[in-house]
Amino acid sequence: MVEPTAFIDEKIAEIADDVGDANAVIALSGGVDSSTAAALAYEAIGDQLTPVYVDTGLMRKGETDQIRDTFDYMDSLRIIDARDRFLDALSGITDPEEKRHAIGEQFIREFETVARDVDADYLVQGTIYPDRIESEGTIKSHHNVGGLPEVVDFEGIVEPMRDLYKDEVREVARELDLESIIAERMPFPGPGLAIRVLGEVTDEKLAVAREANHVVEEELEEYEPWQALAAVLGKATGVKGDNRVHGWVVSVRSVESRDGMTARAQELDWETLQRIQSRITGENENVARVVYDVTHKPPATIEYE
Protein backbone atom coordinates (compact mmCIF):
# COMPACT_ATOMS: atom_id res chain seq x y z
CA MET A 1 0.00 0.00 0.00
CA VAL A 2 1.08 3.56 -0.69
CA GLU A 3 2.26 5.82 2.14
CA PRO A 4 0.21 8.96 1.33
CA THR A 5 2.45 11.66 2.79
CA ALA A 6 5.63 10.35 1.15
CA PHE A 7 3.77 9.81 -2.14
CA ILE A 8 2.43 13.37 -2.15
CA ASP A 9 5.86 14.88 -1.49
CA GLU A 10 7.43 12.71 -4.19
CA LYS A 11 4.81 13.51 -6.83
CA ILE A 12 4.74 17.24 -6.14
CA ALA A 13 8.50 17.34 -6.72
CA GLU A 14 8.18 15.10 -9.79
CA ILE A 15 5.46 17.25 -11.40
CA ALA A 16 7.38 20.45 -10.71
CA ASP A 17 10.48 18.91 -12.28
CA ASP A 18 8.61 17.58 -15.34
CA VAL A 19 6.74 20.81 -16.09
CA GLY A 20 9.43 23.27 -15.03
CA ASP A 21 8.52 26.85 -15.94
CA ALA A 22 5.99 25.77 -18.56
CA ASN A 23 2.20 25.82 -18.27
CA ALA A 24 -0.03 22.75 -18.06
CA VAL A 25 -3.68 21.84 -18.46
CA ILE A 26 -5.40 19.07 -16.54
CA ALA A 27 -8.37 17.01 -17.60
CA LEU A 28 -10.80 17.47 -14.69
CA SER A 29 -13.86 15.20 -14.53
CA GLY A 30 -14.82 15.65 -10.89
CA GLY A 31 -14.02 12.03 -10.08
CA VAL A 32 -11.48 11.12 -7.42
CA ASP A 33 -8.70 10.28 -9.91
CA SER A 34 -8.63 13.56 -11.84
CA SER A 35 -9.43 15.64 -8.75
CA THR A 36 -6.50 14.13 -6.85
CA ALA A 37 -4.21 14.66 -9.83
CA ALA A 38 -5.40 18.28 -10.02
CA ALA A 39 -4.69 18.85 -6.32
CA LEU A 40 -1.19 17.40 -6.68
CA ALA A 41 -0.46 19.45 -9.79
CA TYR A 42 -1.79 22.64 -8.20
CA GLU A 43 0.47 22.13 -5.19
CA ALA A 44 3.40 21.59 -7.57
CA ILE A 45 2.97 24.37 -10.12
CA GLY A 46 0.19 26.66 -8.83
CA ASP A 47 -1.10 29.16 -11.38
CA GLN A 48 0.82 27.45 -14.17
CA LEU A 49 -2.04 24.91 -14.12
CA THR A 50 -5.34 25.38 -15.96
CA PRO A 51 -8.00 22.79 -14.96
CA VAL A 52 -10.34 21.95 -17.84
CA TYR A 53 -13.73 20.30 -17.44
CA VAL A 54 -15.24 19.20 -20.75
CA ASP A 55 -19.02 18.82 -20.79
CA THR A 56 -19.22 15.97 -23.28
CA GLY A 57 -22.95 15.41 -23.00
CA LEU A 58 -22.01 11.94 -21.73
CA MET A 59 -21.94 12.83 -18.05
CA ARG A 60 -24.15 11.96 -15.08
CA LYS A 61 -27.22 13.98 -14.15
CA GLY A 62 -26.22 17.33 -12.65
CA GLU A 63 -22.49 16.65 -13.16
CA THR A 64 -21.55 19.99 -14.73
CA ASP A 65 -23.31 22.05 -12.05
CA GLN A 66 -21.61 20.01 -9.33
CA ILE A 67 -18.19 20.57 -10.93
CA ARG A 68 -18.83 24.30 -11.08
CA ASP A 69 -19.82 24.41 -7.39
CA THR A 70 -17.06 22.09 -6.12
CA PHE A 71 -14.15 23.70 -7.94
CA ASP A 72 -15.25 27.34 -7.95
CA TYR A 73 -12.16 28.16 -5.83
CA MET A 74 -9.98 27.47 -8.88
CA ASP A 75 -9.95 30.83 -10.66
CA SER A 76 -8.44 29.31 -13.80
CA LEU A 77 -11.12 26.59 -14.17
CA ARG A 78 -12.42 26.31 -17.73
CA ILE A 79 -15.76 24.62 -18.46
CA ILE A 80 -16.06 23.71 -22.13
CA ASP A 81 -19.44 22.94 -23.72
CA ALA A 82 -18.48 20.27 -26.26
CA ARG A 83 -21.71 18.25 -26.27
CA ASP A 84 -22.44 18.67 -29.96
CA ARG A 85 -18.85 17.95 -30.99
CA PHE A 86 -18.74 14.67 -29.05
CA LEU A 87 -22.08 13.46 -30.40
CA ASP A 88 -20.91 14.30 -33.92
CA ALA A 89 -17.66 12.39 -33.33
CA LEU A 90 -19.63 9.33 -32.13
CA SER A 91 -22.24 9.41 -34.88
CA GLY A 92 -22.58 6.05 -36.64
CA ILE A 93 -20.04 4.27 -34.41
CA THR A 94 -21.18 1.00 -32.82
CA ASP A 95 -17.92 -0.78 -31.95
CA PRO A 96 -16.88 -0.23 -28.29
CA GLU A 97 -13.19 0.24 -29.07
CA GLU A 98 -13.97 2.71 -31.84
CA LYS A 99 -16.20 4.65 -29.45
CA ARG A 100 -13.41 4.87 -26.88
CA HIS A 101 -10.90 6.01 -29.49
CA ALA A 102 -13.31 8.62 -30.88
CA ILE A 103 -13.84 9.97 -27.36
CA GLY A 104 -10.09 9.97 -26.63
CA GLU A 105 -9.42 11.83 -29.87
CA GLN A 106 -12.05 14.48 -29.17
CA PHE A 107 -10.91 14.92 -25.56
CA ILE A 108 -7.36 15.62 -26.67
CA ARG A 109 -8.50 18.08 -29.36
CA GLU A 110 -10.53 20.00 -26.75
CA PHE A 111 -7.53 20.19 -24.42
CA GLU A 112 -5.21 21.21 -27.25
CA THR A 113 -7.49 24.17 -27.99
CA VAL A 114 -7.30 25.37 -24.39
CA ALA A 115 -3.57 24.61 -24.24
CA ARG A 116 -2.90 26.88 -27.21
CA ASP A 117 -4.96 29.60 -25.55
CA VAL A 118 -2.97 29.45 -22.30
CA ASP A 119 0.33 28.48 -23.95
CA ALA A 120 0.51 25.10 -22.16
CA ASP A 121 3.02 22.43 -23.16
CA TYR A 122 1.88 19.68 -20.78
CA LEU A 123 -1.26 17.65 -20.20
CA VAL A 124 -1.83 16.24 -16.69
CA GLN A 125 -4.12 13.20 -16.38
CA GLY A 126 -5.57 11.09 -13.58
CA THR A 127 -4.66 7.74 -15.16
CA ILE A 128 -4.38 4.94 -12.56
CA TYR A 129 -2.85 1.47 -12.67
CA PRO A 130 -5.97 -0.56 -13.61
CA ASP A 131 -6.50 1.79 -16.59
CA ARG A 132 -3.04 0.93 -17.88
CA ILE A 133 -3.40 -2.81 -17.25
CA GLU A 134 -6.67 -3.07 -19.17
CA SER A 135 -5.39 -0.93 -22.04
CA GLU A 136 -1.98 -2.59 -22.32
CA GLY A 137 -3.58 -6.03 -22.03
CA THR A 138 -6.10 -5.04 -24.73
CA ILE A 139 -9.04 -5.92 -22.45
CA LYS A 140 -10.38 -2.52 -23.46
CA SER A 141 -8.88 0.88 -24.17
CA HIS A 142 -9.30 3.75 -21.75
CA HIS A 143 -9.84 7.14 -23.33
CA ASN A 144 -6.85 8.49 -21.41
CA VAL A 145 -4.53 5.55 -22.23
CA GLY A 146 -5.12 3.31 -25.24
CA GLY A 147 -7.81 5.67 -26.48
CA LEU A 148 -5.36 8.51 -27.14
CA PRO A 149 -4.67 9.51 -30.75
CA GLU A 150 -1.21 8.77 -32.15
CA VAL A 151 -0.48 12.47 -32.72
CA VAL A 152 -0.83 14.60 -29.59
CA ASP A 153 0.08 18.31 -29.62
CA PHE A 154 1.74 18.38 -26.19
CA GLU A 155 5.40 18.29 -25.22
CA GLY A 156 4.56 15.76 -22.54
CA ILE A 157 1.78 13.96 -20.67
CA VAL A 158 2.09 13.82 -16.87
CA GLU A 159 0.38 10.95 -15.01
CA PRO A 160 1.29 11.22 -11.31
CA MET A 161 -0.96 8.34 -10.20
CA ARG A 162 -0.26 5.86 -12.96
CA ASP A 163 0.96 3.22 -10.45
CA LEU A 164 -1.87 3.53 -7.91
CA TYR A 165 -4.99 1.45 -7.40
CA LYS A 166 -8.33 3.15 -6.69
CA ASP A 167 -8.25 2.56 -2.93
CA GLU A 168 -4.74 4.07 -2.80
CA VAL A 169 -5.95 7.12 -4.72
CA ARG A 170 -8.66 7.60 -2.09
CA GLU A 171 -6.02 7.51 0.67
CA VAL A 172 -4.04 10.21 -1.11
CA ALA A 173 -7.22 12.26 -1.65
CA ARG A 174 -8.00 12.13 2.07
CA GLU A 175 -4.44 13.19 2.92
CA LEU A 176 -4.88 16.15 0.54
CA ASP A 177 -8.09 17.07 2.42
CA LEU A 178 -10.29 16.77 -0.64
CA GLU A 179 -14.00 16.95 0.17
CA SER A 180 -15.58 13.58 0.97
CA ILE A 181 -17.95 14.00 -1.98
CA ILE A 182 -14.81 13.70 -4.13
CA ALA A 183 -12.56 11.41 -2.07
CA GLU A 184 -15.28 8.79 -1.58
CA ARG A 185 -17.01 9.19 -4.92
CA MET A 186 -18.13 6.13 -6.85
CA PRO A 187 -16.02 5.44 -9.96
CA PHE A 188 -17.40 6.74 -13.25
CA PRO A 189 -15.76 5.87 -16.57
CA GLY A 190 -13.89 8.54 -18.52
CA PRO A 191 -15.94 7.90 -21.69
CA GLY A 192 -19.03 8.42 -19.54
CA LEU A 193 -22.45 7.18 -20.55
CA ALA A 194 -21.18 6.38 -24.06
CA ILE A 195 -20.06 2.97 -22.78
CA ARG A 196 -23.29 2.46 -20.85
CA VAL A 197 -25.33 2.43 -24.04
CA LEU A 198 -24.62 -0.53 -26.30
CA GLY A 199 -24.25 0.30 -29.97
CA GLU A 200 -24.51 3.79 -31.43
CA VAL A 201 -24.74 6.71 -29.01
CA THR A 202 -27.94 8.73 -29.46
CA ASP A 203 -29.67 11.49 -27.51
CA GLU A 204 -32.53 9.12 -26.63
CA LYS A 205 -30.26 6.39 -25.27
CA LEU A 206 -28.21 8.92 -23.30
CA ALA A 207 -31.34 10.39 -21.71
CA VAL A 208 -32.48 6.92 -20.59
CA ALA A 209 -29.01 5.99 -19.30
CA ARG A 210 -28.62 9.29 -17.43
CA GLU A 211 -31.94 8.98 -15.58
CA ALA A 212 -31.48 5.25 -14.89
CA ASN A 213 -27.98 5.78 -13.47
CA HIS A 214 -29.31 8.54 -11.24
CA VAL A 215 -31.95 6.16 -9.85
CA VAL A 216 -29.44 3.35 -9.29
CA GLU A 217 -26.92 5.56 -7.47
CA GLU A 218 -29.65 7.00 -5.24
CA GLU A 219 -31.25 3.67 -4.38
CA LEU A 220 -27.99 1.79 -3.76
CA GLU A 221 -26.07 4.43 -1.81
CA GLU A 222 -26.84 2.70 1.52
CA TYR A 223 -25.28 -0.55 0.21
CA GLU A 224 -21.94 1.25 -0.34
CA PRO A 225 -21.06 -0.54 -3.60
CA TRP A 226 -17.64 -0.07 -5.14
CA GLN A 227 -19.52 0.77 -8.33
CA ALA A 228 -23.20 0.76 -9.31
CA LEU A 229 -24.54 1.56 -12.75
CA ALA A 230 -27.30 1.16 -15.30
CA ALA A 231 -26.69 0.30 -18.95
CA VAL A 232 -29.04 0.51 -21.94
CA LEU A 233 -28.74 -2.82 -23.75
CA GLY A 234 -31.25 -2.76 -26.59
CA LYS A 235 -35.00 -3.05 -27.13
CA ALA A 236 -37.61 -5.63 -26.14
CA THR A 237 -41.38 -5.97 -26.03
CA GLY A 238 -43.28 -4.71 -23.01
CA VAL A 239 -46.72 -3.53 -21.93
CA LYS A 240 -47.65 -0.03 -20.73
CA GLY A 241 -51.28 0.24 -19.73
CA ASP A 242 -53.19 -1.75 -22.33
CA ASN A 243 -50.66 -1.07 -25.06
CA ARG A 244 -47.82 -3.15 -26.42
CA VAL A 245 -44.56 -1.21 -26.49
CA HIS A 246 -41.13 -1.85 -27.93
CA GLY A 247 -38.93 -0.20 -25.34
CA TRP A 248 -35.41 -0.15 -23.97
CA VAL A 249 -33.95 -2.87 -21.76
CA VAL A 250 -31.95 -1.43 -18.85
CA SER A 251 -29.46 -3.61 -16.99
CA VAL A 252 -28.59 -2.70 -13.40
CA ARG A 253 -25.16 -3.66 -12.07
CA SER A 254 -23.72 -3.25 -8.57
CA VAL A 255 -20.36 -4.68 -7.52
CA GLU A 256 -18.03 -4.95 -4.54
CA SER A 257 -14.29 -4.62 -5.12
CA ARG A 258 -11.04 -3.40 -3.58
CA ASP A 259 -9.25 -2.16 -6.66
CA GLY A 260 -11.43 -2.83 -9.71
CA MET A 261 -9.19 -5.60 -10.99
CA THR A 262 -11.69 -8.20 -9.77
CA ALA A 263 -15.24 -7.66 -8.53
CA ARG A 264 -18.22 -9.54 -7.15
CA ALA A 265 -21.83 -8.76 -7.99
CA GLN A 266 -23.67 -7.55 -4.90
CA GLU A 267 -26.54 -9.58 -3.49
CA LEU A 268 -29.40 -7.08 -3.31
CA ASP A 269 -32.71 -7.74 -1.62
CA TRP A 270 -35.82 -8.22 -3.74
CA GLU A 271 -37.58 -5.13 -2.38
CA THR A 272 -34.69 -2.89 -3.44
CA LEU A 273 -34.54 -4.41 -6.92
CA GLN A 274 -38.29 -3.96 -7.36
CA ARG A 275 -38.07 -0.34 -6.21
CA ILE A 276 -35.32 0.30 -8.76
CA GLN A 277 -37.24 -1.28 -11.65
CA SER A 278 -40.43 0.54 -10.64
CA ARG A 279 -38.70 3.92 -10.68
CA ILE A 280 -36.82 3.32 -13.93
CA THR A 281 -39.84 2.03 -15.86
CA GLY A 282 -42.16 4.57 -14.24
CA GLU A 283 -39.94 7.59 -14.88
CA ASN A 284 -38.98 6.55 -18.44
CA GLU A 285 -41.96 5.74 -20.63
CA ASN A 286 -39.70 4.24 -23.31
CA VAL A 287 -38.16 1.61 -20.97
CA ALA A 288 -39.85 -1.81 -21.30
CA ARG A 289 -37.93 -3.84 -18.74
CA VAL A 290 -35.15 -3.82 -16.15
CA VAL A 291 -32.77 -6.72 -15.42
CA TYR A 292 -30.10 -7.25 -12.74
CA ASP A 293 -26.62 -8.44 -13.72
CA VAL A 294 -25.24 -11.11 -11.35
CA THR A 295 -21.95 -11.70 -13.22
CA HIS A 296 -18.65 -11.31 -11.37
CA LYS A 297 -15.37 -9.95 -12.79
CA PRO A 298 -14.03 -12.17 -14.26
CA PRO A 299 -15.59 -13.40 -16.51
CA ALA A 300 -17.29 -10.02 -17.12
CA THR A 301 -15.79 -6.55 -16.91
CA ILE A 302 -17.53 -4.07 -14.60
CA GLU A 303 -18.65 -1.82 -17.46
CA TYR A 304 -20.43 -3.23 -20.51
CA GLU A 305 -18.09 -1.72 -23.10
From Swiss-Prot:
PANTHER family the UniProt entry points to: GMP SYNTHASE [GLUTAMINE-HYDROLYZING], GMP SYNTHASE-RELATED
Q: Which domain of life is it from?
A: Archaea
Write down the SUPFAM superfamilies for this protein, in alphabetical order: Adenine nucleotide alpha hydrolases-like, GMP synthetase C-terminal dimerisation domain
What keywords are annotated for this sequence in UniProt?
ATP-binding, GMP biosynthesis, Ligase, Nucleotide-binding, Purine biosynthesis
EC supergroup of this enzyme: ligase
- An annotated GO cellular component: cytosol
Source species: Natronomonas pharaonis (strain ATCC 35678 / DSM 2160 / CIP 103997 / JCM 8858 / NBRC 14720 / NCIMB 2260 / Gabara) (Halobacterium pharaonis)
| Recorded metabolic or biological pathway in which this protein acts | Purine metabolism; GMP biosynthesis; GMP from XMP (L-Gln route): step 1/1
Xref: PROSITE patterns = GMPS_ATP_PPASE (PS51553)
- Residue stretches making up the GMPS ATP-PPase domain: 2-185
Swiss-Prot/TrEMBL catalytic activity: XMP + L-glutamine + ATP + H2O = GMP + L-glutamate + AMP + diphosphate + 2 H(+)
Q: Which Gene Ontology terms cover its molecular function?
A: ATP binding; GMP synthase activity
Q: What is the protein name stated in its UniProt record?
A: GMP synthase [glutamine-hydrolyzing] subunit B
Q: What is its EC number?
A: 6.3.5.2
The record ties this protein, via Pfam families, to: GMP_synt_C, NAD_synthase
Nucleotide-binding in keyword set: yes
What InterPro entries has UniProt attached to this entry? GMP_synth_C, GMP_synthase_B, GMPS_ATP_PPase_dom, NAD/GMP_synthase, Rossmann-like_a/b/a_fold
Q: Which residues form a coiled coil?
A: none
Binding residues for ATP? 29-35
What is known about what this protein does? Catalyzes the synthesis of GMP from XMP.
Subunit and partners: Heterodimer composed of a glutamine amidotransferase subunit (A) and a GMP-binding subunit (B).
